C-alpha cells in the first residue's frame, strides 16, 4: 500500500465510519474503483481503532462516568441502581452477539462476505430498513392527522432485551455494506428510541467491539507481518481519527433536527449503481481482491 492510498483510505474511513452508509463498503469500493488491492479486513479493523479513539475523546465525560460508576458498583450495592452502572452492563451485554458471531464467522468475513454483489445488496436492503425506521420515528415526533405525537424512549428506558437487540444489529455490520451505525440506529428507532438515544448507545456499544477487533487483528498481523504495511496503516489510522472526530461532532448535531433520508437515498442509489457496473462487466464483483 502506498502513502497516497493510505491517505485516501484514511479519509474514507473517517468520513464514513459514523454515518449510516458503511465504512467497510466504502473502503472496499474505493479500492475497487481506483484499481487498488482490497485493503482487507485487517486494515479496516486497525483503522477503526483511530475512529474509535475519536469516540473515546468526544464522549470522554460520559465514558469516564459510566466506567467509574460501573466499577464502583461491583463493590457497592447501593450504586447498582444508578443509570451509569446499568449502562456499563448494557454495553457489555450488547457486545456479546458481535463477539460470538465475529469469531464463528471470521473466515467468511474476510472471504466470501467481501463480494461486491453482497455489498450492493446490503447497501440497498439496509437503506430500506433505515428509511422505514426513520419514517416511523418522524411520525411519532410530528404526529399528524388522527395521530398524536408519541413520546419516544430515552437511554434511561433501555433494558437488557433492548441491549441484546442492539447487539444483534451491530453484529450484522460484520457484512460489508450493512453499516454498524446504520444497523444499530435503525434497530433503536424501530424499538421506539429517540434518534439521539439510538445514536449515542450505538457509539458507546461500538467501543469494546472495535477495540477488541483491532487488537485481534494486530495480534494476527504481528504473528504474520507480511500481511500489512504498518507505516501506511498507522498513517491512515491517524487521519481517520481526526476526520472521524469532526464527523461525530457534525452527526450528533445533524440527527437532532434532520431526517436520515439523504443517507437512505444515497445507499440505495449506490447499491443500484454497483449492480449496474457489475452487470455490465465494468466492475468485477471481486475487483481489488488479491490476485484479481
Task: Show where each model-derived region lies.
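Multi-pass membrane proteins that catalyze or facilitate reactions on polyprenyl-/lipid-phosphate substrates
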Residues: 1-292
Amino acid at each position: 500500500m502506498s502513502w497516497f492510498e493510505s491517505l485516501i483510505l484514511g479519509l474514507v474511513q473517517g468520513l464514513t465510519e459514523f454515518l449510516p452508509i458503511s465504512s467497510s463498503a466504502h473502503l472496499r469500493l474505493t479500492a475497487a474503483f481506483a484499481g487498488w488491492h482490497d485493503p482487507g479486513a485487517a486494515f479496516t479493523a486497525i483503522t477503526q481503532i483511530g475512529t474509535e479513539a475519536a469516540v473515546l475523546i468526544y464522549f470522554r465525560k460520559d465514558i469516564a462516568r459510566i466506567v467509574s460508576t460501573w466499577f464502583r458498583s461491583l463493590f457497592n450495592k447501593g450504586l447498582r441502581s444508578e443509570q451509569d452502572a446499568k449502562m456499563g452492563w448494557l454495553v457489555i451485554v450488547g457486545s456479546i452477539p458481535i463477539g460470538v458471531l465475529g469469531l464463528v464467522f471470521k473466515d467468511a468475513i474476510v472471504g466470501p462476505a467481501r463480494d461486491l454483489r453482497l455489498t450492493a445488496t446490503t447497501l440497498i436492503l439496509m437503506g430500506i430498513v433505515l428509511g422505514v425506521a426513520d419514517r416511523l420515528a418522524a411520525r411519532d415526533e410530528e404526529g399528524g392527522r388522527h395521530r398524536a405525537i408519541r413520546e419516544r424512549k430515552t437511554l434511561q428506558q433501555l433494558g437488557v432485551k433492548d441491549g441484546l437487540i442492539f447487539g444483534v444489529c451491530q453484529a450484522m455490520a460484520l457484512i460489508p455494506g450493512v453499516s454498524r451505525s446504520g444497523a444499530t440506529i435503525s434497530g433503536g428507532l424501530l424499538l421506539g428510541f429517540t434518534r439521539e438515544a439510538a445514536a449515542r448507545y450505538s457509539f458507546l456499544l461500538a467501543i469494546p467491539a472495535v477495540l477488541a477487533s483491532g487488537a485481534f487483528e494486530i495480534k494476527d498481523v504481528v504473528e504474520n507481518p507480511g500481511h500489512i504495511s504498518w507505516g501506511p496503516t498507522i498513517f491512515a489510522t491517524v487521519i481517520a481519527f481526526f476526520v472521524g472526530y469532526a464527523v461525530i461532532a457534525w452527526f450528533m448535531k445533524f440527527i437532532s433536527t434532520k431526517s436520515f433520508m439523504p443517507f437512505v437515498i444515497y445507499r440505495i442509489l449506490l447499491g443500484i449503481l454497483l449492480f449496474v457496473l457489475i452487470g455490465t462487466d465494468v466492475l468485477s464483483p471481486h475487483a481489488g481482491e488479491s490476485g484479481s
